């Protein structure tokens, strides 16, 4: 098993409903360690930059508006097969299709406001981590 890092966002809908602690508990219970975290309110420019790969898709404007509608939590998670483990904890993108007990099944209302984001590959994780965190902000958890 490989120790990996992945990137995660707790989106404005889940932050507004005070689900941060419950979601962090899910990460830690699954063996993922939080090695960096911060709360921020994305600017339009930050959201457009982060989601640039979707800029030509019809939902881009609504996505940017949602992601700038309130504070978010961004975090870096570390653990065995972290990318896959995190995505399994999140559940399907559409909460109506997410397995019971997953973050999206338990905390999301719709496919548009689905509580959380997780990197889909190691390459995406590296890019997304670097978008929000400097190397100095990552704190390896060795104890």
From Swiss-Prot:
Keywords attached to this entry: ATP-binding, Cytoplasm, Kinase, Magnesium, Metal-binding, Nucleotide metabolism, Nucleotide-binding, Phosphoprotein, Transferase
CDD domains: NDPk_I
Subcellular location: Cytoplasm
Residue numbers annotated as active site: 117 (pros-phosphohistidine intermediate)
GO cellular component assignments: cytoplasm
Matches recorded under Gene3D superfamilies: Nucleoside diphosphate kinase-like domain (3.30.70.141)
Cofactor(s) annotated in UniProt: Mg(2+)
HAMAP family cross-referenced by the UniProt entry: NDP_kinase
Name of protein: Nucleoside diphosphate kinase
Record organism: Shewanella sp. (strain MR-4)
Phylogenetic placement of the source organism: Bacteria, Pseudomonadati, Pseudomonadota, Gammaproteobacteria, Alteromonadales
């Amino acid at each position: 098993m490989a120790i990996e890092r992945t990137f995660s966002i707790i989106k404005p809908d889940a932050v507004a409903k005070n689900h941060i602690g419950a979601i962090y508990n899910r990460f830690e219970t699954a063996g993922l360690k939080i090695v960096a975290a911060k709360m921020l309110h994305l600017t339009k420019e930050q959201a457009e930059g982060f989601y640039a790969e979707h800029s030509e898709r019809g939902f881009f404007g609504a996505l940017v508006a949602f992601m700038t509608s309130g504070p978010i939590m961004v975090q870096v998670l570390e653990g065995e097969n972290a990318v896959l483990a995190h995505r399994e904890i999140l559940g399907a993108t559409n909460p109506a299709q997410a397995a019971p007990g997953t973050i999206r099944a338990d905390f999301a209302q719709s496919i548009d406001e689905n509580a959380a984001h997780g990197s889909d590959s190691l390459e995406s994780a590296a890019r997304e981590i670097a978008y929000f965190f400097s190397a100095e902000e990552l704190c390896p958890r060795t104890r």
